[in-house]
Amino acid sequence: MNKLVLISGSSRGLGAAMAKSFSEAGYKVAINYFNSEKEAKDLSETLSNQSHAFKCDVSNKNEVDIMLENIKEVFGHHPSILINNAMTSYVFNGDDRKNADSISWDEIQNHLNVTLKGSLNLIQGLISDMKSESFGRIINIGTNLVQNPVVPY
């Protein structure tokens, strides 16, 4: 098993915390970001093991394929662990978040494109490499907002 983990949405928050933990455990870390370039590059510089930041919109299959090729170029092999953690910019403040009567389908579709389509794009981009190595781990991170919603009342 190679010790390379790809964490989508890992420039800040939970993703950055996981990147730090994997680095401390001796893993190389491929940090994926979309908007938070400074945070991603700062994180990459602070990790003790080899790491690198890769910009990619995971909802775009072409960008995912390019990122995976770039990861192989930088590290010499594909990741053996994939953590799907990317989410769209989300407002956790119930008072500032759109309500059901004002949110548009396009906004919902954007969330689905990043969380579901993005995960599928990454899985499909890595699954053949994982099969050929007879090893791979895929972890999908969700949200507990359906169980503990942030509501403005």
Predicted regions located by residue number:
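Conserved glycine-rich cofactor-binding loop
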Residues: 4, 11-12
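A glycine-rich helix->loop->beta "capping" turn
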Residues: 70-84, 104
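Conserved glycine-rich Rossmann-like NAD(P)H-binding loop of the short-chain dehydrogenase/reductase
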Residues: 27-41
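A short, exposed helix-loop element centered on a Lys and neighboring polar residues
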Residues: 123-124
